[in-house]
A protein has these predicted regions:
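C-terminal soluble interaction/assembly domains
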Residues: 251-253, 260-292, 300-302
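Zymogen propeptides
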Residues: 1-169
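Short, solvent-exposed loop/turn segments at the edges of secondary structure
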Residues: 102, 172, 237, 313-317
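Aspartyl protease catalytic domain
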Residues: 113, 118-269
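C-terminal regions of proteins
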Residues: 284-329
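Short beta-strand scaffold segments in enzyme catalytic cores
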Residues: 105-108, 175-179, 240-244, 285-288, ...
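Short, ordered beta-strand-loop transition motifs
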Residues: 95-101, 181, 246, 314
Length: 329
């Protein structure tokens, strides 16, 4: 969420009024087919991940009712491979029946093959002992992807806890992205109290968007405190969110012309049992992949606004890095 908190400038309102997401139209170029990359994994000895068949491929995303599917729309395509298995997939759908020239991307990730690390920003939430605000060291040489985290803490209605330090106190009931020392990630309503042993980070943002497979009743609320202040107080903007499926796989959605309701629908279509909204507005939302060696960054889609190299130097905002499991990143 942008740094103005509850104040949206007159210029932003005018800009949105002059250039809102267009209605109708078609997707320029259609659904892209990504070229999957092979992510580095240890080669010494058999791994549990390579020995098991892994989670089943998710069902295709549901195209909004009333739209004839585009070629490839909603179909999962391989994005990364590890140990001969698909480590990540991506699928795209149009957000609704009105904004038909836009696509929302959903990335599916297998935690048996990938691990997740939360990085604090220099300003959001501020410095955390033992944690870097950029990709560096060994992680930089193996990182496969990064994605944005949540709102500024003053707007998040929740807290930030990492490496034993409550930078901002955790709030019971808040939607929480919980990361463990083994690189696992879960999404839950915080039960209260201190994090359990093995938890290394908790990032909270608003209430749950999806709770036990049910979309929050307030997704159509016009109260900006519920789901965040958008540029020009607009409903249809760039949004992002994260969810975890019943099999433990992780899904991240990101795209333009999204309302809270259509973001929730995309995550639910991807099978999310629990999900939360992450940051919103075009300047803050992105999913970035990296080619190795060299951590060469690429935005997942060309319409993303933030620079692809935003996390290769100190970041003001916190973010999540994704690396191959077993690389020690």
């Amino acid at each position: 969420m942008h740094g103005l908190g509850g104040v949206v400038t007159w210029m932003e309102q005018v800009a949105y009024a002059l250039n809102p997401p267009r209605s109708g139209g078609t997707v320029a170029g259609g659904i892209e087919t990504p070229t999957p990359v092979s992510v580095s994994t240890p080669t010494a000895g058999p791994s549990t991940a390579s020995a098991s068949p892994g989670p089943a491929a998710p069902d295709p995303l549901t195209v909004p009712a009333g739209l004839a599917p585009l070629s490839g729309e909603g179909q999962w395509r391989s994005l990364a491979m590890a140990n001969g298995r698909t480590a990540a997939r991506v699928a795209q759908i149009r957000p609704d029946t009105v904004h038909t020239s836009y696509l929302v991307s959903v990335v599916w990730m297998d935690p048996q093959l990938l691990m997740f690390t939360l990085h604090p920003g220099t300003e959001v939430p501020g410095a955390v002992p033992g944690a870097m605000s950029q990709l560096g060291g060994a992680e930089r040489s193996v990182v496969w992807a990064t994605f944005n985290s949540g709102f500024q803490m003053k707007d998040a209605r929740g807290g930030y806890w990492q490496n034993g330090q409550a930078v901002v106190p955790l709030s019971a009931g808040a939607a929480s992205m919980v990361l463990t020392s083994s690189g696992r990630l879960s999404v839950m309503a915080w039960p209260g109290g201190e994090p359990q042993a093995g938890v290394v980070a908790v990032r909270q943002n608003l209430p749950l968007l999806i709770d036990n497979g049910v979309i929050a009743a307030s997704v159509n609320s016009t109260v900006t405190a519920d789901w965040g202040k958008t540029l020009g107080n607009a409903a249809y903007v760039w949004r992002s969110g994260i969810g975890v499926r019943a099999d433990g796989t992780v899904v991240v959605a990101c795209g333009p012309a999204l309302s809270v309701a259509s973001l929730a629908s995309a995550l639910l279509s991807a099978g999310a049992q629990n999900a939360m909204e992450l940051d919103i507005n075009k300047d803050w939302t992105s999913f970035i992949t990296y080619d190795q060696p060299g951590a060469v960054p690429h935005r997942l889609t060309a319409d993303q606004v933030p620079a692809a190299n935003r996390y290769l130097s100190p970041s003001k905002r916190d973010f999540v890095a994704v690396a191959p499991r077993g690389t020690g990143a």
